[in-house]
Amino acid sequence: MADENETVVSAPVSTAAWIYVFPKEKELLDVLSVLSLMERNSPVVISPLLMNLTVENDFSTTVKTPITNFGGTILTKITSFMPVCFFFHGTEQLVGMAEDHGDLIRLCEQTRQKFHLQSFEVPTARKVIDIKALCSAVGKDADSVICHVACGNGFKELLFAGLLIPCVEEQIQVQVGEYSCVKIPLYSATLFETEETISLSSCTEFIQERGFFLPALSETLFYYVFTSWGTTLRFSNTKELIDAGLKQFTQDGEQTVKLAPHKTYLGISGQKISAVEKDFLMLVDSVVTELSFSHVAEYLDSVYDPSQIMNFNDWPIIRNSETHAERMAQLTNLKLHLSSHLAVLIFAPNSILYCSKLAFIPNVKQAFNSVMTQELLLRSLSFCNALSSLTEDVYNDNRKIIKCDSTSGKDDKFSANHLAYACATCPQLLSYVVWNLNRMSVYNAGNAYTEIYNHLVNCSANLCEFCDGKCCQSCIGTAMVRVGTRLPAIPKNVKKEPLVMSMFSRYYAEVDILGSFGRKPVSELKEIGKDQQNTLSLDRGKFVSQIFDYCKKNSLIDPVTGEDTFNVRSKKDFVSIIHGLTQCIEECVSRCIVEMRRTQTPREQIENCLQSFNVDTTPYATAFSPFLTFAYYKVILTVLQNLALIVASGHVVDRPCTGNSISKWLVQQYQSLYGTFHSSYLKKGFLNTRTVKVASNVDMEQILDCDLYKSGKYVKTTIQAKLCRLSMQCLRDFRIKNRPFNKSSKTAHNNPYFKKNVKHKKNPLSGCISFLLFKYHDKLFPNVKISCLELWQRFLLNNVPKTLDIGNPEEVKTFIKFAFSITNTYDEIDIIDIQPECLSTFIDCYFHNKFLSALGFHDYLTSLHGLTSKLVTQNPVLFPVVLDKQPKFSSIQEYLVYVKKLVLDGVPNPVIASLSKEPNFGTIFTSRSLVTFGLTLEKFVSLANREYFQFGQLGWIGGSGVDRNLNPTSSALQDFRFMRQKTIIATKFSEVIVKKVRRETIMFDTEVVKGKVLSIVENLTNDIDPELLIIAEVMRDREDKPTMDDMLFFVDGREALAASIMLKLNHLVDMNVRDFSIANLQSVFEAVSSNDAPVYDFSEILAEEDDQASGVLKCDETETETDEPMTKKNRL
């Protein structure tokens, strides 16, 4: 939504490109090596634009840059700097720190040939700038400095073409962090030459002699920026894309057609659609490409303030580090945390890196030969995975097919070429991705470990196609083998899927169970003082706050952190505390319902409630990572194309093309299209912008006299600087929403995924207080030496031997009866289907379950879940990157022995990022996190004015290799919970600086083990500790002890249970136990036998319900099991 009132801002008159000359200091190079994109054989390093690291503290991110000289007046344009800078000189030592991943440059070139992408060609007539002379001119020794260039978005084409003129006479001494540096301005060649002489293919003598042209820098820009933009826009002619951008900025060509005459249409020939539908698709494709390219420039050439994360010295991990070694360790940890998000973008087939194909997916309900309308066309268009179309024939501007000359044919499996394509064939980007792949978990699907071992043994033959046997321990070939089971499948059919993206979250979020329902609007709060009439809306939060006030008053929850603080001294104390809390919750629910009636709040408001959060769309939100900046540009371009579909579909249907040339038709229609699109998507529910007005459009400035400088004289003169555009729109955020109540169809109440069937759970360890029973087991039963899991198993079987000192039997009976009672009471009303892991979640779920059930809601809700990144250590045998040399092993055993020797010699276990369940979802946003999620941009027509609005629907993350937490537990359990859960993956920056689809046929070993662990606790056994059974199953095919992170996964995130099992497992390891059979485990722990011993009688409690429980963590349900296979369960 555009702001109602314009924000007045100011910006200095300054050039939009600077060369920075740094001293070549070891500590600076160390920091840059972690934060930058670099490749061992590429001299250019892509680094983040950060204050006190690469630019000075008071660096202006937005400037009015002089662009045209009219004699007595200089015309200026607003532009903001790119969030990255490019080190181009003195980088030999820096790139030498990069890990060797093989010949990535050759791989990228092969990829371009295979998928018909343009390669950079060095202009033979251009003179290369003399860097040594430039350094000497500012008093620096070229061999002792390292140089980078920071460039505005509008200047990137000028920088690529060598059309920027350095002015060493205006050098400035600046302090960047701890280093004294020199920066040199780069002025646009348009100030010195006429527009007619500014071109990519030719230049004047002045530009030839003075222009800042470096082929290596231009090549990096060609791939990192322009090829990336081209693949996102389905525009393969990268040179024409650069030329169009150059003319657009220097000649104000936003409202003219620039790309269409040179565009080819990829991914259309392979779609099984009619000729008419192909025509519609090509016309829409040309429109959205042109509109998006024009508008992305307008948004990026706008006013943006530096974000909070742009000041390197203010990062907590930097400020709190006392030594350089500590700083480097923290930065490396940050890089590993970010690998969680990179993994999603690489392994998800619906990632923003792949989904550039515009597909026509006909509506199955559409009648044959029916008249095409805007609504029908819009509903049929979707962006989807493009990997299967990269070698297809293409259509040209005249709608004639151009045969593909590729001999490779279609790929059935994801390869290194596809990975290079996703990285826009930029070696620096590809090297960064491979570094991360080498440090990601291996998902075993039966023989993955053996495949890795065999690969390493075969490396001794020096036949690797990527590194020729020079660095197989870290090369891309080994990385692809390691994560082979996790790589995305190449889709055979087009399908509508959400787009997976990584963005920086904003603080605002309404993500509790009922989201927007019962929230007091800000406008209403302002009106209270003006009008005291009793017409206020329901304030649901007031009643939830009353419960938390009760908890704080009774010392149950920490008032600051929200953590559990209550102390349980006995069973009676436990019953008293929980009973009092549930009574308080039920009273607040009653008051809330009374208030709902008093305010005449209809039940429909609950059904229509929305959960929502915002993500930052300013260019500097992800400035800390050049990889995320690369992905950010793809997100903005794709979203703009998606929004442009509304205008394009209506225009194409109303004004179809009757000639052969698409570009000629577009030239005729473009003024109308541009004007309609310019404001069509603002204030429409998804894309939020702000309107800014520059304070002064005319300034008297001391500026370089361009005419004299061209003749060899440096003179500054006072001249009038006039701004071309005074008011503009700036990107602010996206609004992402979710509907908790399923309203996807009229038969939603019959949907098996949301239908709540009658359950008869009798085991408290599967219910709402399980986290408390595990946590306080030692205090509830201080003299019992068996685990919580085994004790409650024996309670269920009425088989607790009297040799166990459980305390007063009558008190125990009362306690057990209460535990069963609250579990069954909660289960009867539970439609949220979230098992609490802390007291605050228990309160939230109990309150809303009680509230909704009292109002007659019975079906399950859609719930939001978070997975946050954490660092864990791993077994080094699956991480060949720990090797210090090229593998030369004759057998697998020799490799394993060598790695064990490395560990004994002190080589640390590799640290990688893993994902764990976030117990309190809302903290993801209050902690200002980087979030990765799926987005479906829905469009709907307003009945009032027939305008189209957008709904940014939170979607799922595709693929079975993204993370094991995202995959369903087991197809045999018939548990549809994963169909109702939407997940966001997050890294909380406050501490260190998330959908599900149907199961694929692949099943990883860890998931098999998890299914068996849960199966163990579903089947009653006598005299065997369930924890011992779990240990036996987990260790069945393992040689090494699982980590706590692994155990949490196996027991579905129950931390107390995992800790109890790990305690036993650590004891076994300390005793050097190798036999993990049940018999041996029982002998080690001297399991309590109850065959002959007398037992306590709890039969009267267990007989209160007719249906008997059949498990510990999950009991049998009475609903009819469906025979529908898991592969048929499509994500809603």
Swiss-Prot record:
<comment type="subunit">
    <text>Homooligomers. Forms double-helical filaments necessary for the formation of replication compartments within the host nucleus. Interacts with the origin-binding protein. Interacts with the helicase primase complex; this interaction stimulates primer synthesis activity of the helicase-primase complex. Interacts with the DNA polymerase. Interacts with the alkaline exonuclease; this interaction increases its nuclease processivity.</text>
</comment>
<comment type="function">
    <text>Plays several crucial roles in viral infection. Participates in the opening of the viral DNA origin to initiate replication by interacting with the origin-binding protein. May disrupt loops, hairpins and other secondary structures present on ssDNA to reduce and eliminate pausing of viral DNA polymerase at specific sites during elongation. Promotes viral DNA recombination by performing strand-transfer, characterized by the ability to transfer a DNA strand from a linear duplex to a complementary single-stranded DNA circle. Can also catalyze the renaturation of complementary single strands.</text>
</comment>
<feature type="region of interest" description="Disordered">
    <location>
        <begin position="1109"/>
        <end position="1132"/>
    </location>
</feature>
<comment type="function">
    <text>Single-stranded DNA-binding protein required for DNA replication.</text>
</comment>
<keyword id="KW-0235">DNA replication</keyword>
<keyword id="KW-0238">DNA-binding</keyword>
<feature type="region of interest" description="Required for nuclear localization">
    <location>
        <begin position="1112"/>
        <end position="1132"/>
    </location>
</feature>
<dbReference type="GO" id="GO:0003697">
    <property type="term" value="F:single-stranded DNA binding"/>
</dbReference>
<dbReference type="InterPro" id="IPR000635">
    <property type="entry name" value="Viral_ssDNA-bd"/>
</dbReference>
<dbReference type="InterPro" id="IPR043031">
    <property type="entry name" value="Viral_ssDBP_head"/>
</dbReference>
<keyword id="KW-1048">Host nucleus</keyword>
<dbReference type="Pfam" id="PF00747">
    <property type="entry name" value="Viral_DNA_bp"/>
</dbReference>
<dbReference type="GO" id="GO:0042025">
    <property type="term" value="C:host cell nucleus"/>
</dbReference>
<dbReference type="InterPro" id="IPR035989">
    <property type="entry name" value="DBP_sf"/>
</dbReference>
<protein>
    <recommendedName>
        <fullName>Major DNA-binding protein</fullName>
    </recommendedName>
</protein>
<dbReference type="GO" id="GO:0006260">
    <property type="term" value="P:DNA replication"/>
</dbReference>
<comment type="similarity">
    <text>Belongs to the herpesviridae major DNA-binding protein family.</text>
</comment>
